[in-house]
From Swiss-Prot:
Belongs to the metallo-beta-lactamase superfamily. The active site is at D109 (proton donor/acceptor). It comes from Aspergillus novofumigatus (strain IBT 16806). It is an enzyme of class 3 (hydrolase). Pathway: Secondary metabolite biosynthesis. This is Atrochrysone carboxyl ACP thioesterase nsrC. Zn(2+) 1 binds at H105, H107. PANTHER family: ATROCHRYSONE CARBOXYL ACP THIOESTERASE, ENDORIBONUCLEASE LACTB2. GO terms for molecular function: hydrolase activity; metal ion binding.
Amino acid sequence: MAPGVGGYRQINKALNICAFEEYLESQQTHLSSLPNVEQISPRVIRVLGQNPGKFTLQGTNTYIVGTGTKRLIIDTGQGIPEWADLIRETLSGGDFLLSDVLLTHWHGDHTGGVPDLLRMYPDLTPRIFKNTPDRTQQPIVDGQIFKVEGATVRAVHSPGHSHDHMCFVLEEEQAMFTGDNVLGSGTAAIEHLSTWMVTLKQMQSHGCKLGYPAHGAVITDLQSKIGSELAGKLRRERQALQALRQASRNGSGGPGKGRLTVKELVAAVHGDRIDDGIRVLALEPFMDEVLRKLAEDGAVGFDMRGVLKNAIPDIKARKRFR
């Protein structure tokens, strides 16, 4: 998958996806192999999007849900022709049709297959559902229910990875389609850290045991996985605060104030031997998001320098611990 394809570049304008390549390639080597089509539960068939990559893992998962002659489909892959072939073969082989198309969010690796789906099944044209829809789609709202034989699917608005992100609870299985908020392996790119953390706690509150992620294998203990995701982000917050406290003890920024640039803070947390490209293009933007969350929480203050009126603050603006 080419860097930036599928909507990821838009998540954080300062993030250059290429900077993650070495890390993501090493992560990919540990991924389990998944079949192109697999019946993963009595009610759920998973179809791979045929778009494996550094951010998509084994590929975008499409889920076909239900047990009868009419079924739901969740997400549509990236628009790879081989994916469309798999969908057609799966439907004809199982002798069932699709009633509704549910999209977790707007990114291209989830919505790119819609044109192929409508070309094959034009009757679905008025049955494409998405939160904050465009003029060709129908809305999904929090709590909305979609029912087919053998499956009751409840929509859960879950912003964080993207503003329009939806998860879906499969009531009969105590399972949740987690979209890109929680992946089968590793952690997702995040549009807004503070919102994402609130959302993950909300996702936990539904009490689902299984997770069907948009990328990666089935999550067998969703509660534990969500807990680990939250703990990892909180650990980064603590490390950032610890570094700022140390700076305050050293007198940087004046009495009781720890003042560090984002560059200095990344070095304090990750060490000073990090590749410059990864530091500038990956770690600094993420640390900036951590600091913005801490500022929202009232834990740190901003001391901007060299900022023009109406301009976006430089990522190297200095941060002040309170």
